[in-house]
Amino acid sequence: MESNDRSLNIVFKHSGKKTDVSLNSLKGAVVEFLDLYGTIPLAGKKFCSITGEGDGEQRFSNLLKKTGYSSDPKGFFEDLLSILVNGKMKKITVNGIQIPHLMLMSILEQVLPGHGYISIKDTHQLEKTTHIKVSEKDRKQLQQVIETYPVRLSRHTIRQMLVSKDVAYQYLPFVEELDSGGHTNTWIGQFHDGLLEQMYQNRVIFLLNMACPVYCRFCFRKHKDSRNETNPCVEDVKKAVQHVKDSPGVKEIVVTGGDPFLNRANMAATIDGLMQVDHVQTVRLATRSIAYYPDLFLENESAYLKYLKQKSFELQQHGKRMEVATHFIHPDEVSPESLDIICDLVNNGIAVYIQTPFLKDCNDKGPELVRLFSLLRGAGAELHYIYIPCSPIHGNSIYWSTLSEGIRIANHLRAHLSDRIIPRICTATPIGKMDWYSSGWAVEKVKDNENFIWIRTPYTPDYFKTFAPLANELTNIRVNDEGTIDIQYMAKIGDESFLHGPRPEREVTEKKSASSDDIEMLKSELLKERQTGPSIVDAGDNSGFEKLLRLHETRVEIDARAKDAQIDYIRSDDKITDVIISSSTDAIDSLFYIKPLIKKLQDIPHVNAVRLFSSKFNVEPKAYTRAVINTLGDLNKLCVVNPLRLEIETWFTLADEITNTHEKLVRRLNNKGITVYCNTALLGGVNDSDAHIHSLAYSMRKAGIEFHHLYAAGLSIQQKWNRDHPVDSYDVVDIATKVRREGSGREIPRYIISTLLGEVDYGLTSSFVFDNGQVRIKLGCYDLSYYKKLDKNFEFPAGIITDDDGSPLVQVPGLIKINNFPVS
């Protein structure tokens, strides 16, 4: 400690731990935070307005003045630390100013330094380690919990828990875990041999390691028996790899545990073994350590990250890809370290996708999910699933929400999130996942058992015969009249209007097939005519190259030659996160104009993504020369602070359009951290069958293209073609059913209806309303106030009526509905 430095004496109230912290180290941590991370996305708009402009020193000086501690950093820290040591697990304010969570983390790293993780054996150790009070009335029961469901914490999460009840809620044991409600496990009989499990025809699970550095209280493997299982060895891995070699239908392997990254030998044997299996396309590595134990990847000069990047390159040389799956649940879990890990992986061609359990009283209101997903997106992550409800395992009941609450969250996300980061709302049933209102729904309550409901799934008895015949012998399933399986699922429905009964038999309708000439004409029109919907509100001057379309609260589209007026419009509204750039030629032919445009957008902190529309990606992929790819890579800015992510949007109609050339191009772009996503228009008689879309989804997945939107109706081309060649809503559900059942979960698009008032999810954030013989689409995620916040003079266009709850009802030509069943 420097001679002119002073130290602060700290005593944690509940652990009794005493420590001295250098005042200079605290000040240095805050100055560094303000210098590097004190931005609006990371620290908040209000806090940044308080700290003002300048370097970290100046901004800290401004903060001291605003909190009443001008030129008195010691007083400031004494005040802040006096709150922190009480272990209240809450946000901290100093004289009315809330200190950002990430700044508190910077301070705590000085107060409670260290890495690694700790296994907790008793309540006294829990109190000493976390500095959080254990109630005497709960101590005996908590000890029983610890002995039943092991507790393990990282020092990283301990720091987070001290100032976030939402992080503590996930990892601290609680007496309600003794509630016997729920299952012992959710595994019920699909193929299981050693470390290998199989739930789907085309993918298997490798359980490489049974322990984790931190134990989530809601985990479906939380039981002590699961935590203490003997870890497999390299010979077990080789046996599992041989099973994959002997199973040509297996295309993807999910490597999980526990945390598989804790067993380096098994990880190496898995990757090296699967690399030699010709029919394997994707190796997916699952870990939560990015969120709760980032040191695993960053220690030893980021040795594990370097290893993964090398192995990813080797997999690419064998025509395969590596992906990393992780969980984030609340924005308080997001750290600069976790964002840095995601950026590093994605910038090196390794996709990172996020799965989020829906936890009651933690992330079940909407705004916290909007912030969480926005932070992760800028780093390059893809948002994959929200699981509703939390796994129905023993001791998890405090986390359970009703199904209707989970389904309704989709309305908030569709209204307030970029379309590129809206996860699929799904439920993991004991026989496989289903997506709400496309591949499944709640049918009815189970008679004489109020804790279970029947869920319609996309699976059939024949599906399991080749790999898991026991699945058809289960007593909690039934085959419905359409031939798919309904399964009893442990959950409360909540709002009983979400129980929809069985799907009615399909009425026979004539379907007109398109000629080959028609198909070529439609494909050509899709490439020539931009399918963007209209501006949902007045966005000012829309003349010539200065045209700007406000497509959503978060999204605008501009031309490559947009002027300063359009940039000013974007800058003036901090709800805008995404800018789509299109051109009368093609985005890659307009890079001269796009480069300075992106540089201007980089100075707008709330914009974190730019999307370039490129039809040439489809028809002329060789136009993406090395120079073009390098230029695009230079424009892509995946980073922790003020990111600006670059993505390519393209359109395909049929699977035979996708070639090996596209696959190679996607790989080159991915290795620059650039995602390619595709939209598809469902066209009557062209591709409106489950076989067509399943084939298209598979081809996209194989090429590495993300299948983003499958438009059921509403695009300009659909309004023209589908009037005479209508798409049947029944086909939409048949398509979703087959894609979910036969494909990878990573192949599934969002099923979308485009309207003049914005986009909605088929069935999930929209519904069919019958009005005097006409069918209208109810936009459940929007109302008049939504549009008035974007344009105070907005009024609904002529012909738009509203439902009793204020939701607009619109007509969408070309989509027919021949029954009154809510889903299809």
Identify the residue ranges that each predicted region occupies.
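C-terminal accessory extensions appended to soluble enzyme cores
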Residues: 405-536, 728-824
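Chitinase-like catalytic core of GlcNAc-active glycosidases
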Residues: 233-235
